A protein has these predicted regions:
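Hydrophobic alpha-helical membrane segments, chiefly transmembrane helices and signal peptide h-regions
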Residues: 3-15, 83-84, 102, 121-122, ...
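N-terminal targeting signals for export/organelle localization
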Residues: 1-67, 200
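Short active-site neighborhood of thiol/selenol oxidoreductases, capturing the structured segment around
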Residues: 74-97, 103, 116
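Structural microenvironment flanking redox-active thiols in thiol-disulfide oxidoreductases
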Residues: 97-136, 146-153
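A short beta-strand-turn-helix
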Residues: 56-58, 63-84
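Thiol/disulfide oxidoreductase modules built on the thioredoxin-like
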Residues: 134-138, 145-200
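A generic structural signal for alpha->beta connector loops
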Residues: 82, 113-114, 139-140
Length: 200
């Protein structure tokens, strides 16, 4: 019995240190623009989604249009230009919950230079996700991809876990992407300098 408990503990520790494994896809249709979500979003002060004006580029974000989480303009990801940091998260992802205040801190200090965009990914608990947004104080724009449309959409890999970061340059190219659990704003600043060439 103790051996089984030890194995389970090791598996749980591995999950916490390496990210959260994705659950199976849920129902075919999940509404991310309901009156309740709109009210919660407004109360949280989440900024509106801003569609881009660019054309698709090689190595850029995929030609995938996602709805604005909690209502607002849909966004074709391929139209976006950086420098920008894109974060994929979900309410069921423990490490995502822990790092969201770090992302918000970065947003508050550097949004004019490097905007932050969050994507609630493969998350069927949309009310719980918006509650998490309220709890963590997130205000940067949020899209939703409850059916994991981005999974394998070039240049994204087959998603195995969260949290996930992508760095987009001024030409709209994804210059770097990785599964990473942020522990400090400085860690994110270092990644921005390394991959986007910006020292903030």
């Amino acid at each position: 019995m103790r051996a089984v408990a030890a194995v389970l503990a090791a598996l749980l520790l591995a999950g916490c240190t390496s990210g959260t494994t994705l659950p199976s896809p849920g129902p075919a249709q999940i509404d991310v623009d309901t009156p309740e979500l709109r009210t919660m979003k407004a109360d949280a002060g989440v900024e509106p989604c801003r569609p881009g004006e660019g054309e698709p580029v090689e190595g850029g974000l995929p030609e995938v249009t996602l709805p604005c989480f909690g209502g607002g303009a849909d966004v074709d990801l391929s139209s976006l230009r950086g420098p920008m940091v894109v974060n994929l998260w979900a309410s069921w992802c423990g490490p995502c919950r822990e790092e969201m205040p770090i992302l918000q801190q970065f947003h508050e200090r550097h949004a004019d230079q490097v905007p932050m965009l969050g994507i609630d990914y493969q998350d069927q608990q949309v009310t719980g996700a918006m509650e998490l947004v309220q709890e963590t104080g997130v205000t940067y724009p949020l899209l939703a991809d409850p059916q994991s449309t981005l999974d394998g959409a070039t240049p994204f890999p087959r998603m195995q876990g969260l949290p996930f970061l992508a760095f987009v340059d001024a030409d709209g190219r994804v210059v770097h992407q990785e599964f990473v659990i942020l522990e400090s704003e400085q860690q994110l600043l270092d990644l921005v300098e390394k991959h986007l060439g910006l020292r903030l």
